[in-house]
Regions:
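A residue-level signal for conserved active-site and pocket-lining positions in enzyme catalytic cores
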Residues: 23, 152, 188
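Short glycine-/small-residue-rich flexible loop motifs, especially phosphate/cofactor-binding loops
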Residues: 48, 74, 137, 166, ...
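Metabolite-binding pocket within alpha/beta catalytic cores that recognizes anionic/polar moieties
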Residues: 1-134
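Active-site rim beta-loop-alpha module in soluble metabolic enzymes
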Residues: 123-172
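A C-terminal functional module that forms or caps the active site or interfaces directly
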Residues: 163-187
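Short, conserved beta-strand edge motifs with alternating hydrophobic and charged residues
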Residues: 87, 106, 148-153, 178
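Active-site beta-loop-alpha junctions enriched in small/polar residues
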Residues: 91, 157, 182
């Protein structure tokens, strides 16, 4: 198999599990908590590092901002054998009890973006794998930091949200808004 055109990797070079932050700068910081970190590739917004965290081999791959670039990364990671994707990053809280530094574990994502419509009908919910979701909730609850579990929103217009739009999401019970989770859930 040839190298993937955007990630510049091929089968056998990556771990089965990938952390997928949007920001390449996070790919530089996450290995500070790991051992044996090694840069595998870097192209455009995509930076890939293999590392070991507490005995678990993993790959860290930035996706850039938004669902389109995340979908490219996820498609190419899956093509070379990555099986589990864990999104790590920032989000905008929609509920007053969520504070900076809290952990949010998404049980699903309202699809308010265009990428997922190319993969399935918009009526199909974007939900994570239940086994991965359960493991994340259990791990998050074992930490001393606050954790919030529930549905979120994925949007593709960072500066276009009006107060009314944000209020509607909040009243619907969505925990936060970000720009990649619906694509991750749909593609994974």
């Amino acid at each position: 198999m040839a190298k993937q055109p955007h990630l510049l990797v091929e089968a056998g070079e990556l771990a089965d599990i990938a952390l997928v932050p949007g920001d390449p700068g996070r790919v530089d910081r996450i290995p500070d908590h790991c051992e044996n970190a090694e840069t595998v590739a870097q192209n455009r917004e995509y930076k890939l590092v293999n590392a070991n965290y507490e005995g678990q081999e993993l790959t860290i791959c930035s996706t850039g901002i938004g669902s389109p670039s995340a979908a490219i990364a996820l498609e190419e990671l899956a093509a070379v054998g990555v099986e589990t994707f864990l999104r790590v990053g920032t989000t905008g809280a929609l509920q007053p009890e969520i504070e900076i530094g809290d952990t949010v574990v998404a049980t699903g994502a309202a699809k308010d973006e265009g990428t997922t419509k190319r993969y399935e009908k918009s009526e199909v919910p974007a939900v994570p794998d239940y086994g991965v979701l359960s493991a994340l909730v259990e791990a998050a609850e074992d930490r001393s930091a606050p954790v919030h579990v529930g549905p979120i929103a994925t949007d593709d217009a960072f500066y276009a949200e009006t107060d009314a739009y944000v209020e509607a999401w909040s009243e619907a019970g969505l925990l936060c808004v970000e720009m990649e989770a619906a694509a991750l859930f749909t593609l994974a």
